[in-house]
Amino acid sequence: MLNRLESLTQRVGGSNELIDQWLHARKELLVSYCTVIGIKPQKEKHTPLNAKTLENFCHNLVDYLSSGHFHLYDRIIKEVEGASSPKMALTAKIHPALKNNTQTIMAFHDCYTNIEIDDDSCTEYQQALSDIGEALDARFRLEDQLIQWAAESWQAAQLADADKKSQVN
């Protein structure tokens, strides 16, 4: 997921401040996920379970979900083409899948926030972490469709503006 994020950032990073903020928030979430599962990016050594890292991950998870649902998705579409855009259909198509995905992710959050993981629950917890990783991957693939579309739209608008300016001159 980090590699795919890096590739996406190289393709669309710098095209718009909203996208840059979104990608930065995703990176923070992924780093906290890697930390909570015991992987240190760019290192081979696993780290033991730490309640503080789980708390940090759950906090980043809620922040990320909230910013997407209540800030980024529709704002990006409206900023690109306006509220009456036919491209709002893209969000209408993706939104139900994101909503279902959010419910899955929030179930993890609700289950593992303020809970102590002991030897008896460790296997279940490890499976839940694997499941949440798959849910995040699915979510990022959906969001990538929005990000790619927005970046392409902004680039096309910039080219159109440049053409207009060159025709005037």
Swiss-Prot record:
Write out the GO biological process terms: regulation of DNA-templated transcription
Family matches, as InterPro entries: Rsd/AlgQ_sf, Sigma70_reg_Rsd, Sigma70_reg_Rsd_AlgQ
Q: Which domain of life is it from?
A: Bacteria
Q: Name one GO cellular component term.
A: cytoplasm
Which cell locations does it reside in?
Cytoplasm
Pfam hit, one: Rsd_AlgQ
Q: How does it assemble?
A: Interacts with RpoD.
Q: What is this protein called?
A: Regulator of sigma D
Species of origin reads: Yersinia pestis
Q: Which gene encodes it?
A: rsd
